[in-house]
Amino acid sequence: MVQRGSKVRILRPESYWFQDVGTVASVDQSGIKYPVIVRFDKVNYSGINTNNFAVDELIEVEAPKAKPAKK
């Protein structure tokens, strides 16, 4: 399940970041076509480092880190 903080690999062939790994910044639950915002370390030709993707265009590589328990 893709969720905030997950490391994901991009499967959209026309994307600048195709086969690259990025971090999920947020997942929108409203039903839009591209609900997952992914942030990358490198920028594209326009200087942008985020993009929206559909859930089926992503493969989760690493689950998000668990938050430490509060005392």
Curated annotation (Swiss-Prot):
Record function comment: Stabilizes the interaction between PsaC and the PSI core, assists the docking of the ferredoxin to PSI and interacts with ferredoxin-NADP oxidoreductase.
Keyword Membrane: yes
Location in the cell: Cellular thylakoid membrane
Any one of the GO CC terms: plasma membrane-derived thylakoid membrane
GO annotation (BP), single: photosynthesis
InterPro entries: Elect_transpt_acc-like_dom_sf (IPR008990), PSI_PsaE (IPR003375)
Key words of the record: Membrane, Photosynthesis, Photosystem I, Thylakoid
Gene: psaE
Family: Belongs to the PsaE family.
Protein's organism: Trichormus variabilis (strain ATCC 29413 / PCC 7937) (Anabaena variabilis)
Pfam families, per the entry: PSI_PsaE
UniProt keyword Membrane, yes or no: yes
Superkingdom of origin organism: Bacteria
UniProt name for this protein: Photosystem I reaction center subunit IV
Membrane topology term: Peripheral membrane protein
